[in-house]
Amino acid sequence: MWKKFIPYALLVPQIILGIIFIAGLATGITQSLGVIPAFGLTEPTFKYYKEILSRPDIVKSIIYSLYIAVTSATLAVLIGVGMCAVLVMNTDTKGKGMRIIQLPIIVPHVVVALFVVNILSQNGLLARLLCAMGFIKEQQDFVQLLYSTNGVGVIIAYLWKEIPFVIYFVIALMANINGSLGEAAINLGASRLIAFMKVTLPLCRRAIGSSFLIIFTFALGAYELPLLLGPTSPEALPILAHTQYIHPDLENRPYAMALNGIITIISMICAVAYFRLMQKNTEILNRRKAKKEHNEKK
């Protein structure tokens, strides 16, 4: 009898976490609309959204955050897929090489920021090496990569973390397709490159799109790297939201929640797009499975 309740018991932790998440999300949404009874704010309004979207500094922060997220996600996908292609066409998708590539995935972002500062700052290893070799006269002549408004330091840190993620996310599917349909195209006369570009890569586009959405959403809402490596102005949206949240005037809280609301809206759009990609993948797999079963019956 107890065996019937085991599946439901296993769902309890997920249900608890789901309730906490939904409660927090609902609280954030209501506060972003100006409903905080403890502060004497009881009427919902879009005033806070309108005010933050009309402030030039916040608009710059939104543009900066989108720029960091889009650039890092795009470059990570392009470089990651390119490395996947090299590994797959050389049939080197397992072994020590892949383990080394996957190592950055488990490294915390704070540690990555420390690495980047020690290597790419004007007092870092690279600046010292170039100065010692005579390429630059002084360490201060080294190009300013960190804390600049172009966000190069933040993007480099994201690339170091996210390129291995793209490889890990895509390479299994790419290797499987290239080993079956890609080889079939080669046997029919296509070159290895043409087979990859015309057969393997198009069939991986949904997995590649999914990896882009995951990286974009994470980079948009991440706090550590923009804080440690980014400029003081414009600030990334998560930093700006935290600054507003800890403001001494508690009536400033709705502004922080409105900024979080913008991040949430963009993230939800990405989540819906990701769900649609996964749904299409499932439909394709089901059709292939049904077709295979039909052929076997014949």
Question: Language-model features: where?
Answer:
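Transmembrane alpha-helices
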Residues: L11-I22, L103, V107, I156, ...
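Transmembrane-helix boundary motif in ABC transporter permease subunits
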Residues: M1-W2, T27, T71-Q102, L114-N118, ...
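Short membrane-interfacial helix/loop motifs at transmembrane-helix boundaries
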Residues: I20-P56, M133, G230-T232
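Membrane-interfacial helix termini and adjacent extracytoplasmic/periplasmic loops
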Residues: A113-L159, L229-S233
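Interhelical loop and adjacent transmembrane-helix boundary motif
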Residues: W2-I6, Y49-D57, L227-R276
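Non-cytoplasmic
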Residues: G24-G34, V166-F169, A207-L240
